[in-house]
A protein has these predicted regions:
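Non-heme di-metal
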Residues: 1-176
C-alpha cells in the first residue's frame, strides 16, 4: 500500500498541473485503457480455466470501465462542446492494472493489483468531485467513486470465493 500511496501522491501532483478540462479528458481515455486490460485479464482467466465467476467479473469490469469512459465523454462534450483530446500522460489506473499481466498465473497477485486499481479509481473520482466547478459532474464523480468501491468489494469477494486472502492495508477504511 506504501507504493500505492506514493503513486497517488505523484498522480495528485501531476493532476494539479492540469486544468479541469484536461483532467476530465485524461480520465476518459484512462477508463478505456483500463477496459482493455480487464478484457485481457478475462481472456487469460479463460485460458487458465479459472472460475467462471472470476472471468465474468473481469468482463463486467471491462464493460463498466467502457461505460464510465462513455459517461465522462458525454459530460465533456456537454460541458466543452467538443470531443476530448488525448492527454499525453501515463494512465495511472491502466498502468497499475497492467502489472497484473506481468504474472497472470499468480491469481492472488492479479486480484491484489486489480483491487488496488479500483481503490485508486475511487480516490481519483473523489478528487475530481472536490475540484470540479460543475455540480452535475460532481454528482457523477461521486457516483463513479461509489461504483469503484463496489468493484473493489466484488474483486475481494471473488478472492474469498477462491479461498484467497488479499490484504490491502487501509482499504476497508477507504470507503468513508
Amino acid at each position: 500500500m506504501e507504493d500505492l500511496e506514493k503513486l497517488l501522491a505523484d498522480f495528485e501532483r501531476m493532476l494539479s498541473k492540469l486544468s479541469e478540462k484536461e483532467v476530465l479528458a485524461y480520465w476518459i481515455f484512462g477508463e478505456y485503457e483500463e477496459a482493455k486490460i480487464y478484457w485481457k485479464l478475462a481472456e487469460k482467466a479463460e485460458e487458465l480455466r479459472l472460475p467462471a465467476s472470476l472471468i465474468g467479473t473481469f468482463m463486467d469490469l471491462a464493460r463498466e470501465s467502457e461505460e464510465h469512459g462513455n459517461t465522462l465523454k458525454r459530460i465533456y462534450v456537454r460541458t466543452y462542446g467538443e470531443e476530448p483530446k488525448k492527454i499525453d500522460l501515463p494512465y495511472i489506473e491502466a498502468e497499475v492494472l497492467a502489472r497484473a499481466l506481468e504474472d497472470p498465473e499468480n491469481i492472488p497477485y492479479v486480484l491484489k493489483i486489480a483491487m488496488e486499481t479500483e481503490l485508486i479509481a475511487k480516490r481519483l473520482y473523489e478528487r475530481l468531485a472536490e475540484i470540479t466547478q460543475d455540480e452535475n459532474a460532481r454528482k457523477v464523480y461521486k457516483y463513479l467513486a461509489d461504483v469503484e468501491w463496489t468493484h473493489y468489494l466484488r474483486l475481494k469477494g471473488e478472492a474469498e470465493l477462491m479461498g484467497i486472502r488479499v490484504e490491502i492495508p487501509g482499504a476497508e477504511v477507504a470507503q468513508y
